[in-house]
Amino acid sequence: MELRDTIPGMLSPDYKERFTAEYEQLSIRAQKLETFIDNYRHSRLSFKPICSIELLEQQLDIMKAYIAVLEERAKIEGVHVR
């Protein structure tokens, strides 16, 4: 799934569809950041990032915590994610 695939869900009048789209977007972004960090750590980037790996890892940790919050809400609210 790509970010563009989540657009219909984000535009839906149904909050459960918007919720699912938000979860999907965050998951996609977190996975891409995780891949980026791995490539950064192993010198596989074609450029030198300005941000430190530590700051990017902090961002990823927060994104993962946000994903966990959304998963807990999904259970409570009966929204199917993943």
Where are the regions that the model predicts?
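Extended, charge-rich alpha-helical interface modules
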Residues: 2-82
